[in-house]
């Protein structure tokens, strides 16, 4: 028997260089974004969700880490990897983000900045789940 991994879903766990040095700046950046737009937008969330963000000094550090990973990793043959947008979410106890996908995105990522004890988990489900149900 031959097994062909036709539609694999890879999840990469990548460390951001100097993350400890920028964590406080990230939290300040997020707080400033929320103060500037306290209502935010509603997508898949019950908490606060920012507008799409394109750039900023703190986001540049995150972008650099991602670009370095994808352009230097032999697993992918990606030329000129580019981060095209970011969103910020801030959830209070009881807030959620429902299961969702990112149409048109070749890759998506999460940077978990602060999680109080007894918080919920980040869960991933197969993007091919529609193939698992009989119609």
Name the predicted role of every residue range.
Residues 1-79:
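Non-heme Fe(II)/2-oxoglutarate
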Residues 6, 80, 101-105:
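A generic structural micro-feature
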Residues 85-135:
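Catalytic core of non-heme Fe(II) oxygenases with the double-stranded beta-helix
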């Amino acid at each position: 028997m031959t097994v062909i991994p036709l539609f694999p879903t890879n999840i990469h766990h990548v460390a951001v260089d100097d993350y400890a040095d920028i964590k406080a700046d990230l939290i300040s950046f997020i707080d400033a974004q929320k103060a500037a737009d306290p209502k935010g937008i509603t997508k898949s969330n019950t908490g606060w969700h920012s507008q799409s963000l394109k750039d900023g000094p703190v986001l540049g550090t995150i972008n650099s880490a991602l670009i370095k990973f994808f352009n230097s990793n032999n697993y992918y043959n990606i030329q000129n990897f580019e981060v095209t947008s970011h969103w910020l979410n801030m959830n209070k106890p009881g807030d959620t983000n429902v299961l969702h996908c990112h149409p048109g995105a070749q890759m998506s990522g999460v940077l978990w900045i602060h999680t109080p004890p007894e918080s919920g988990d980040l869960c991933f489900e197969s993007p091919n789940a529609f193939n698992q149900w009989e119609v």
